[in-house]
Amino acid sequence: MSEREFKILTDVEHVLLRPNMYIGGINLTENEQWIYDKESGKFSYGTVKYVPAVIKCASELIDNSIDVAIDTNFEKATRIQVRVDDKSIEVVDNGIGIPCEPPKNKPGETRTCAEIAWTTLKSGTSFGENRNKIGTNGVGSSCVNVFSSLFIGESDDGTRR
């Protein structure tokens, strides 16, 4: 049974083995498309090189902020700042924060909801009924964390940080 050996993988092992399923392609891609030149204020058609997975990771973090805006009827997360450079992506919002306490549905759990959201697949607030969310699978931030060499998460729920 060597070639067809039955295996059970952890969530993280599966994400690493099949990244395309979670965050898209991990290889450099080349596409012809319209490009905006900020200095001239004009568009030109040219070749863009990028890694789709990097775009998806940025999108996952931005989507979390947008979900807070939707959840609060656009009273919170009204300002979403995104900073991207050659080695990092930073997303900051003025939202409500992820609770800095253990989840109520898991007695005995000592990790905060924030830590769980950033480190555990299939966790979050997107599993209730009548949810209008962009993120629905509970894998976004935790997948970004899996592929990050450094992941810093900060949350302030109004009581704790």
Give, region by region, the residue ranges found by the protein language model.
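Bergerat-fold GHKL ATPase/HATPase_c domain
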Residues: 1-59, 70, 104, 109-118
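Short, small-residue-rich loop/turn micro-motifs
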Residues: 19, 95, 121
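Conserved ATP-binding N-box helix of the HATPase_c
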Residues: 49-80, 140-147
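Active-site phosphate-binding and catalytic loops of NTP-dependent enzymes
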Residues: 24-28, 45-47, 65-81, 124-134, ...
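Structural motif
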Residues: 83-85
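GHKL-type ATPase core
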Residues: 1-6, 87-111, 124-161
